[in-house]
Amino acid sequence: MNKKHLKTYKNVYSNPVKSDILWMDIEGLFRALGADISEGNGSRIRVKLNGERAVFHRPHPDKTTDKGAVKSVRRFLENARVKL
């Protein structure tokens, strides 16, 4: 994991919740953590990490992630027992 992934991880857990995290940075974090990512229908992606599964919707046309999605990513990482 590089500095960019660590920064994204910290941004996901920052309070108040950020709404300006680029989705591609979150996907990069998933990959750096060893997640399996597969394409779903439309702009959905399926993510599996440490036995935990989730489906996320890529934001469009904006590339930033809204607060609700950031909270979902946070819950997913917690359920997957990711700690840095």
Please give the residue ranges for each predicted region.
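Basic nucleic-acid-binding interfaces
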Residues: M1-L84
